[in-house]
Amino acid sequence: MKILVADDSRAMRMIVIRTLRQADLAGHEVVEAEDGKQALDLVLAGGADLILSDWNMPEMTGIDFLRALRANGVATPFCFVTSEGSDEMREQATAAGAIGLISKPFTAEAFATALSSVVTA
C-alpha cells in the first residue's frame, strides 16, 4: 500500500510516519509532499492508496487538494491530520469526501481507529 503524507512541516511528516509505525500500520511505502500542489502532482502521476494531509499548507491547502482530487475523478481515501479540528472543518472535510480528520496532538490509537478500515496489512 502506498501512503502519501502531505504537510509543509518536515518534522510533522516524520511524526505522522512514526505514528503510523506506532499504530501497527508500518510496512507500507510512504511518499512525502511539502504542499497540496506537490501532493496533487504526485497522486496524478503515480497514484496513492491512502492520503494523509495537513489542512493549512502553502501553494494549495489540504481542502483544495482534496477537492482537486475529486474533480479529477480520484477517489483515494483521504484523511486530514491537522492542528485544528473545528466542527466547520470536519463538515467541510466530510462534504469534500474525506474519511476523517485527526486533530493534533494525536495518538497512535487515534490513527489506528481512523485508518483501520482503509489500511491493509
Where are these regions (language model features)?
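Two-component/phosphorelay signaling modules centered on CheY-like receiver
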Residues: 10-31
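Conserved Asp/Asn-Gly motif in the active-site loop of CheY-like receiver
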Residues: 30-37, 108
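Acidic catalytic/metal-coordinating carboxylates
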Residues: 35-38, 61-64
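Active-site beta3 strand of CheY-like receiver
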Residues: 46-52
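Active-site residues of response regulator receiver
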Residues: 54, 82
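Receiver (REC) domain active-site loop signature in two-component systems and cognate sites
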Residues: 57
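Alpha4 helix (beta4-alpha4-beta5 surface) of REC/receiver domains from two-component response regulators
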Residues: 64, 85-100
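C-terminal output helix
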Residues: 106-115
